[in-house]
């Protein structure tokens, strides 16, 4: 009886171990942590320009003036742990200064924002090992669409949600709404990662693999956010060493950790398809 259970356990764990071994090999071969470091560096250079462009778009549409404040609070409360208020203050100051830029300066902000999107595109296609490239005009159109329509769609979604919550019948669903609001950051991360893994690679990605990889990345992101916030508040070594400028290394570490999670989700998505392909080739061999 015990031997039978052990055999069944071995039968089920062997494919998992083989897949984990394949995942580890791909992470090593793709230099995932180095890619994450490159993206973290570009992200810090592009962070203020990207936010400046996004909120400039909101300013161009008066109906989104109140929604932009809600989105700003939501982003810093749910996606930047522990020091979100401090970072938000600095970034809002930088954005206010950028509003006084000339046309040439504004063009530079847009180019820097597009540079981040190009770096993400390049890193993900490196992981997928895709040699096919999109036409430059098409890539620029996609990046520009994400940069302009993405924030507006998010604003419209939040505006509709706020309107529905203000309706009288919604008061009877307070408990359900509270639970949904707690899950909303996870659902939003899951959807964003799924779109990232499905659309950005220039090769075909199976939808199921992208959903699984995105779910793992979203769960790790939420867990990592709480763990990072706990570490910063429990072991305030950065504040003791760096003092007032401690927010800079804290932000860099968090951005680097975030990109490690994003790229790990991409590696999981790729490995699921590669492992399935290897198993198919094994069964077809005589």
From Swiss-Prot:
Parts forming coiled coils: none
* Entry protein name: UPF0761 membrane protein KPK_5501
What GO CC terms are in its UniProt record? plasma membrane
* Chief location of this protein within or outside the cell: membrane
**Pfam families with a match to the protein in the record:** Virul_fac_BrkB
Cysteine disulfide partners in this protein: none
Q: Which organism is it from?
A: Klebsiella pneumoniae (strain 342)
Give the record's family classification: Belongs to the UPF0761 family.
**Keyword tags:** Cell inner membrane, Cell membrane, Membrane, Transmembrane, Transmembrane helix
Q: Which first-to-last residue range defines the signal peptide?
A: none
Subcellular location(s) of the protein: Cell inner membrane
Where are the membrane-spanning stretches?
A: 44-64, 74-94, 104-124, 140-160, 183-203, 210-230, 244-264
Specify the protein's topology with respect to the membrane: Multi-pass membrane protein
């Amino acid at each position: 009886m015990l031997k039978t259970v052990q055999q069944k356990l071995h039968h089920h764990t062997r494919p998992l171990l083989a897949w984990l071994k394949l995942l580890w090999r791909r992470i090593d071969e793709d230099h995932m942590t180095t890619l994450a470091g490159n993206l973290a560096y570009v992200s810090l250079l592009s962070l203020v320009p990207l936010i400046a462009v996004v909120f400039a778009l909101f300013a161009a549409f008066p109906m989104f003036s109140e929604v932009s404040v809600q989105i700003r609070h939501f982003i810093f409360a749910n996606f930047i742990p522990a020091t979100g208020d401090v970072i938000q203050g600095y970034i809002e100051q930088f954005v206010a200064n950028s509003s006084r830029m000339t046309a040439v300066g504004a063009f530079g902000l847009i180019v820097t924002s597009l540079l981040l999107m190009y770096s993400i595109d390049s890193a993900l296609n490196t992981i997928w090992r895709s040699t096919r490239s999109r036409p430059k005009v098409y890539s620029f159109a996609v990046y520009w669409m994400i940069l302009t329509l993405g924030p507006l769609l998010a604003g419209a979604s939040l505006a509709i949600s706020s309107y529905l919550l203000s309706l009288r019948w919604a008061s009877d669903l307070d408990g359900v709404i509270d639970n949904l609001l707690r899950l909303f950051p996870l659902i939003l991360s899951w959807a964003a990662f799924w779109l990232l893994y499905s659309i950005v690679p220039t090769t075909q990605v199976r939808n199921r693999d992208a959903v699984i990889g995105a779910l793992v990345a979203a769960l790790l992101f939420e867990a990592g956010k709480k763990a990072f916030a706990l570490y910063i508040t429990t072991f305030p070594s950065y504040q003791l060493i760096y003092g007032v400028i401690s927010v800079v290394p804290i932000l860099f570490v968090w951005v680097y950790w975030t990109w490690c999670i994003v790229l790990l989700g991409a590696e999981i998505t790729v490995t699921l398809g590669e492992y399935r392909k290897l198993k198919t080739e094994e069964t077809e061999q005589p």
